[in-house]
Amino acid sequence: MEYQFTHSIHGIVAKCSMEHEVFARWLNTEIIGHTQNLHNILAEIEKCRAAFPNHYECVFEGQEYSLYFDCDEVIVKVNNLAMAIDEVIVEEGLQLYDQESVAFCGLEDFERFLQAYHKFSSTYH
């Protein structure tokens, strides 16, 4: 996952590579300005690691985006997405990909993204 943080008079803004741009919008919407949410998510990631190899899932429902993760994968999606990811029936050879509504990444990449944001925000605040 590629990402970049910038700081201006309007505050911090996260940007991600095209296939992960929903993560940037999630961070900009649900985390920036809500530091406690960041700490809660990082704490849940630690609980997830401690539970391994047992299955552990966590959901954070925000105002605009929801975050789902287990010990392997993280999913962020727009709350008003018409169909739940599990309910989508895809015909053979057809892929469902809506880069503006849902994105996936590994838990380790996601944790590095959050830690990099935390470090950046600590430097500029």
UniProtKB/Swiss-Prot annotation:
A Pfam family the protein falls into: UPF0231
InterPro entries cross-referenced by the UniProt entry: UPF0231
HAMAP family tied to this protein: UPF0231
Family from the record: Belongs to the UPF0231 family.
Protein name: UPF0231 protein HD_1708
Organism: Haemophilus ducreyi (strain 35000HP / ATCC 700724)
Lineage of the organism: Bacteria, Pseudomonadati, Pseudomonadota, Gammaproteobacteria, Pasteurellales
